[in-house]
Amino acid sequence: MSSENILKGDFHIHTYHSDDSDLRPEWIIKKAKELGLNIIGVVDHGSIKGGRETEALAKRIAKNLVVFAGEEIKTKEGEIIAFNISKDIPEWMDLEETCREVKRLGGFIVLPHPFDSFRRGLGVSARRIVSYVDAVEGFNARTMFDRFNRNAVKFSKENDLPVIAGSDAHFMEEIGMAVTFVKSRPDKESIMKAIKSGKAHIMGWKSGFKPHVKTFVQKRFR
């Protein structure tokens, strides 16, 4: 049995299955290996396809890389991330209905950029689903104002929820701009358990305005 080690992860990376990203699974894996990442969370808007493709490829070419495949789901109130689900979850449902469906599938719920009012953060609606939430994205590298991340950390502390960090990468240079360190064995079940137990710590660097411009261009001309 593998022993616990400090693992390094970026829990929020998009692929070309999102209309505002150009990242391919093989690029993501290559960059993760270059950065010494042990864990990546790969999500797309409304789809688990990119995460599934990345996970399957990693099993062939990067067996020591743990890939969490997931979906960033738009609800009527804002966005959530669901990891560890077996199928796409429909978008634009009520927030509680979406969370119930994620949990029915055995999913792990993360609140991405919850207080970023520019990017479908849940804001005060997050309070309604605390009982469903497994982790809060305490640092999102694409968040433009520091107070949005500070408010996410504050919310996590007030509600006794663990934090993770995600770059929200849509392009290569963004991968690894936010990092989660977690003491765990290198498998998904152990990592999820360790995060829930408060064994994760976060750090990150803001990626600035340029990625948002690239995202706009990508969506406009794709």
Task: Tell where the protein language model's regions lie, with residue ranges.
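Short glycine/serine/threonine/alanine-rich loop segments
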Residues: 37, 65, 107, 161
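Short beta-strand/loop segments at the ligand-binding rim of alpha/beta enzyme cores
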Residues: 8, 64, 104-110, 114
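Divalent metal-dependent hydrolysis catalytic cores, especially in the metallo-beta-lactamase
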Residues: 28-47, 108-110
